[in-house]
Amino acid sequence: IKQYAGSIPEEKVIKVGMDICSALVLCESKHIVHRDIKPENIMVSEFGDYKLGDFGIARTMYHTTQATIAGSDRYMAPEVITRKEYGKEVDIYSLGLVLYWMLNNCKRPFIDADYIPSNEENEQAQLRRVTGDPLPPPKYGSRKLQNIVLKACAYEPKDRFSSAREMY
């Protein structure tokens, strides 16, 4: 989905969210954590379905937690960046950030949707996200969709959806 620029229709954001949630439901049933959900790893099929790709750093989680850094830090959950133990909630967070990006003119949290940030501003936005500043709502999307995205992107894993099935 990386080829998009500008405002993305809400229906498309919802379709991406539902299709990737379906992929994560399957991952969760197999105890797999993807760990690298980002726009570049979401492809569209010839039938218009969105697929999650690049399982190169995915890991199985059998009653254990991970504490290794893997994935793209732009979409990485705070607990991964800060090297805390984590579980499947990191995929919920990353999907939430992808949906946020789609609803915010392809800009990440703390970056104005109508502005091209400098590298320093991007770094400051990343720091604010990782240190727990509450995310502002994305610029576009219904209040209901914004609330779903913000819950998925909650700083504390316990405040996120507990599973992809719940988010779906």
Protein language model regions, located:
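Activation segment signature within eukaryotic-like protein kinase domains
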Residues: 16-17
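Protein kinase catalytic-loop region centered on the HRD/HxD motif
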Residues: 22-32
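Conserved HRD-motif arginine in the catalytic loop of eukaryotic-like protein kinases
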Residues: 160
